[in-house]
Amino acid sequence: MSHMRIARRAQRIEPFYVMEVAKATASLARQVAHSAQPMIFLNIGEPDFTAPPLVQQAAARAIHDGNTQYTQATGLQSLRERISHWYTTRFQADVAPSRIVITAGASAALQLACLALIEAGDEILMPDPSYPCNRHFVSAAEGNAVLIPTTSEERFQLSSAKVQAAWTAASRGVLLASPSNPTGTSIAPQELKRIHKFVHSRGGITLIDEIYLGLSYDP
């Protein structure tokens, strides 16, 4: 019996090793669950509580009312309008509902964006360290993630100077995260503007992973 042939672009993607850590900690947690020192999880980006009651009630109500069919490909219009309103009230940013697409999480959104915007061989500049899956999304689009080392003094974020120094004829854009996983740091707003201005001047794209935006607190 012959083995199924896996596409080369899939073979380039490395395992997500944090899940192995999660398995090991879950096993240890079961051992100490009823002891005087239960485990506090700090290993994976998932809270130890469930969805708020309002969310649970809304989900149950949608099922009860039969709202379980296909939506528009871009998501529920009413939800897109509410998200547009949230950007207006939270950031005073005018983001029209027509520019909003609902996906099954940030990973799906980033992967779709990469598939839509990155050609084979395109380079995407990213800080190192950064969330491993983000560079895999670039690889899935047959692009090349260029990891630029960062330091604690730089808050593990890219600067405009570093982006300009690393930019080549093959560069397509940057993929940033703020707040970042795994470092938890945010990029300074003015630095982000400088990066975007430079990338835009080169005809490039600025992708930003903001999955932890709601966990950002001003001093």
Model-assigned labels for residue ranges:
Residues 140-146:
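A short helix-loop-beta submotif of the ANL/AMP-binding
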Residues 11-105, 112:
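N-terminal small-domain helix-loop-helix segment of the aminotransferase-like
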Residues 1-15:
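Conserved PLP-binding active-site segment in aminotransferase class I/II-type PLP enzymes
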Residues 146, 152-219:
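Active-site phosphate-binding strand-loop segment of PLP-dependent enzymes
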Residues 28, 141, 201-202:
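Helix C-cap/helix->beta junction micro-motif
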Residues 94-100, 120-123, 170:
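Short acidic capping loops at alpha-helix termini that bridge into adjacent secondary structure
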Residues 116-138:
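Conserved PLP-anchoring active-site segment centered on the Schiff-base-forming lysine
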